[in-house]
Amino acid sequence: MSLRVRQIDRREWLLAQTATECQRHGREATLEYPTRQGMWVRLSDAEKRWSAWIKPGDWLEHVSPALAGAAVSAGAEHLVVPWLAATERPFELPVPHLSCRRLCVENPVPGSALPEGKLLHIMSDRGGLWFEHLPELPAVGGGRPKMLRWPLRFVIGSSDTQRSLLGRIGIGDVLLIRTSRAEVYCYAKKLGHFNRVEGGIIVETLDIQHIEEENNTTETAETLPGLNQLPVKLEFVLYRKNVTLAELEAMGQQQLLSLPTNAELNVEIMANGVLLGNGELVQMNDTLGVEIHEWLSESGNGE
């Protein structure tokens, strides 16, 4: 099945965005096809960030109707073009975010040389401008979206194993945490470290500016003996929390974050990013581990 995708011309889209912004401020701006009659002159700034067309005859009539009548035989462009080139600021740009410090004036061309497609027509203090190219509008900050939240997970360690072992794991088994760590993650990004204290946890380091990518790769031989030897990374998640940006910033100030009651009894067991079960955080001899209370085996019967 083929999808019907509406095509958007970026040039016209930028013109339309500016038209909407101008209209919002009470200025008339329309996207339309210009007439191809008469002579036209293209203007642009020195950096070529924008370009627009003018019809010299219309401009001369707007500035001086008497001169416009006299210029019918001589050609209005022969009067307007030298004036534009010689004047430092010949007109006020009707689009506030555009610059007109140095104006580039091209030679007059017939209307047949106008570009295909619509142009943005806006009146300046000297006459009509037909914009062909415009830059993006300046970004306007709309403030922080207060409802936006980020999912954090507080990881207490991980272990590397193989697929064949998963089939032998059941309720009551203890999965040892081979690599103990106390790290805060948002999706695959490591944000920092935390300490477990009485009554909750405290985020000790939180560097949002230099977020690290989580390394989920497991060192294996170049070739695997079989599918049962595929690597599996077990991750043990003590707690999950969705936070706002303000809450995330507060965590970086070593604010105490309360854990839910009996958080140690509900540690999530993730395998390659998939939730397979949960259990209780225990210590077997000198090694932390998780005793499985719930386990989703490949057969789906939890055994």
Swiss-Prot record:
Keyword Transmembrane in record: no
Top-level taxon of origin: Bacteria
UniProt keyword terms in alphabetical order: Virulence
Keyword Transferase among record annotations: no
InterPro entries reported for this sequence: FliN-like_C, SpoA-like_sf, T3SS_OMP_SpaO, T3SS_SpaO/YscQ/SpaO
NCBIfam families in UniProt: PRK08158.1, SpaO_YscQ
Family: Belongs to the FliN/MopA/SpaO family.
Protein name, UniProt field: Surface presentation of antigens protein SpaO
Organism in which the protein naturally occurs: Salmonella typhimurium (strain LT2 / SGSC1412 / ATCC 700720)
Taxonomic placement: Bacteria, Pseudomonadati, Pseudomonadota, Gammaproteobacteria, Enterobacterales
Name of the gene this protein is made from: spaO
